[in-house]
Amino acid sequence: MSRSRITLLRTHCHECAYVSGRTARLEFLSPTLRLNDHRYQLLLEQGFRRSGPYVYRPHCPGCKACQSLRIPVARFRPRRRHRRCQRANANLHVTACPPVMTQEHLALYRRYIDHRHPRSSMANPDHAEAEGFLAAPWCTTVFYELRTEAQGSLLAVAVTDVLPDALSAVYTFYAPEAEHRGLGNLAVLWQLSEARRLGAQHLYLGYWIADAPAMAYKASFRPHEIFDGRGWRAQE
């Protein structure tokens, strides 16, 4: 899928949600373009990402702080902090579920958004808004549920796209009272193990900004690769 064969549209400039004082702008694919898992994986390789059915990448004037980050699955080696996280959560069970927002999912998602983004446009979503943000009709998506025991309390959901040769972490939401368990990191570790089981080459973690504390955890998974607009650079 070459750039000459796709139509890119651009949003208006708006205030950046991650870097204070910066202006943000996105370019996105025309909604008329027919997508599937294979085509979307090619777009991920070029620095794109999806939000619901919309595929976009940053195109900000005078700023390239947002960089796509992916982990080469076969080369990943957990650090001490990752092993501690796994041991602390050894009692959790993971179940793969279809990308359908149940009432239980929605209640957890709302609590998470209210805790992490109380004044954002994401606050208090209804069912259609939540499911529309997390899933896409043309993409194979799995909701990985993390529970305290089989059929026990739902602590987290790791929304993941399962592609021909890669996994992409779409969004993870979890119980605010369980934040100390490091469930975001645990979700990535699970996605890596699942990618290894499926024989996938990469796990895509979305965009990373070096100066954004909320994104610092992504760079702790090493080695990883950063897309610089022309190719992927290894970061050991």
Swiss-Prot record:
Disulfide bonds: none annotated. It comes from the Bacteria. Pfam families: ATE_C, ATE_N. Coiled coil: none annotated. It is found in: Cytoplasm. One of its GO terms (cellular component) is cytoplasm. It catalyses: N-terminal L-glutamyl-[protein] + L-leucyl-tRNA(Leu) = N-terminal L-leucyl-L-glutamyl-[protein] + tRNA(Leu) + H(+); N-terminal L-aspartyl-[protein] + L-leucyl-tRNA(Leu) = N-terminal L-leucyl-L-aspartyl-[protein] + tRNA(Leu) + H(+). The keyword Cytoplasm applies. Its main location: cytoplasm. Its EC number is 2.3.2.29. The keyword Acyltransferase applies. One of its GO terms (biological process) is ubiquitin-dependent protein catabolic process via the N-end rule pathway. NCBIfam families: PRK01305.1-1 (NF002341), PRK01305.1-3 (NF002342), PRK01305.2-3 (NF002346). Functions in the N-end rule pathway of protein degradation where it conjugates Leu from its aminoacyl-tRNA to the N-termini of proteins containing an N-terminal aspartate or glutamate. This is Aspartate/glutamate leucyltransferase. It comes from Halorhodospira halophila (strain DSM 244 / SL1) (Ectothiorhodospira halophila (strain DSM 244 / SL1)).
